[in-house]
Amino acid sequence: MFEVRMADILVIGGGGAGIRAAITAAELGQRVILLSKGPLSRTGITPVAGEGVEGAVNEGDSSELHYEDTVKAGRGLADENLVNALAQDSIARIHDLESYGAKFKKNPDGSFATSLRPGQTHSRNLFIIGGGYGLAASLFRKLCRLPNILLIDDAIVIKLLIQDGKAAGAIYLDIRTGEVHVVSARSTIIAIGGYEELWPFTDTPPDTTGEGLAMAYQAGAHLIDLEMVLYYPGVVVYPPAARGWLVQYEYILNPDILDGRVLNGKGEVFIGGFPARDEFMRAVRDQVKQGTASPHGGFYVDLTQSRYSREVLTERLESWLHQFSNLKQVGIDLRDDKLEMAPAAHYCLGGIKIDEFGRTNIEGLFAAGEVTGNVHGANRMSGNALSETQVFGNRAGQQACEFAAKAGVMPGSYEAEVLREYKTVNGWRAGKDKGVRPIELKARLQDVMAQFVGLERDEQSLNDGLAEVCKLRKDVLPLLTVLPIRRFCYEVQEAYEIRGMLDLAEIVILSALDRKETRGHHYRLDYPQTDKTPYHTSIRLVKGEHKIATIPVTKLKS
């Protein structure tokens, strides 16, 4: 009926952090099973990420300055031990990527080409050729050379297994066969990305649904700062053919690269300089409130007033902005045409609370990448996301191996839990009068989140949103129905996703209600001030009840 596969290390997630964790664990001699929701190296956020990765490689720069810039960019909310680990390890992990086959843009003398991004005191963004896909492909090639890894894709994890308070593996659904199986492991690493798909306008892939984060919460994981969602200012909102494409404003506005402008609906420049993402997002929000936004609620980027010649612009657009050619295919030439953009959900700053070694509050459970919550704080600096995947993927892999070496075999009886999942799936397949498909329920949830938990929040809107989410879970979720087929029934995956999304939406809203201040990407109309002392919002599930608290930000160990 079901299989139990044994591993020393179970890695959940096939993006940059998960693959890096699996590589480290396998190189340390552990038997590794990696579960990925989609095809490895072509799923999740990593393959669609931009080309920037941060590392202090230039003369005059240092890991100490990288640390200081990141702490400042996080608006006081980044845990300093984690930031220190990120800054100290990033260069070594970049060299690892080169050894795996990743290619970087280089200067004529062979040094790394870099660019300056908002918040950096030194030019620190390196360029991976091929962007996130180039990174993912190099990791995948390295992974395939290691003999002690079992890769299972088209697998959606249903439940984390906890025995005697320790992580013991997971139950997953094989989408290809429709069968439910178990991985029993001495330690587990969760690296499943963010939850941007809670909102309808995002530049991330549709599998960034966050149900794995809800699953970790149900298992007892300590979550932190879930209200902090980074809205990237520069995502195409019109024309429809390009909606959701990220166009890096850091290149557009950089006077040394493209020297562009940002204009409101009246054609006026409304922000100058080189703003950080949260500052830019708030400026766009102000244009919307004043009625001076572009027709679709955003702004325009304009290169027609650039000080550079058309020839120089062409060379730089082709070299620095891969979206240039894509936009031309849908009728937009950035040299001649204004492009309408708006803020979109781009990166989840909240997630599982970890220490600098990727350890969570559950013994044997480790986490890395965007699923974690206390690395960047209330705003993330460009390029640190890909660095984070490699630094903390490696650290979590190392620590998981140390734990597994000391852990005994975790025997268990899983039949009852597996049968429970078959019953759930069969209930969805049975069909219901007036049944609701997963995609319909997802759209309704996204509408709620956009209306009540968007760029601007207040107590009334958040409470209204919470009531709507609870109503959807109580009245609509029981009507969920999927196609009555077993093999490759992706509606079953979507059903599990929306079930987890509803759970996650509730605790995101509870966290937003608890943070009675404005900080970074969290803006409260009723609490526009920023508190003098930064704090984390912490939420845990204790005996079936949500326990919310404020906890201090971790300072750097001396």
Located regions from the model:
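Glycine- and aromatic-enriched mobile tails/lids
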Residues: 1, 5, 16, 24, ...
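Conserved redox-cofactor binding core of oxidoreductases
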Residues: 93-179, 191, 232-241
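Conserved N-terminal glycine-rich FAD pyrophosphate-binding loop of Rossmann-like flavoproteins
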Residues: 38-69, 75, 230-236, 241-246
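Core beta-strand elements of the Rossmann-like FAD/NAD(P) dinucleotide-binding domain
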Residues: 4-7, 178-187, 361
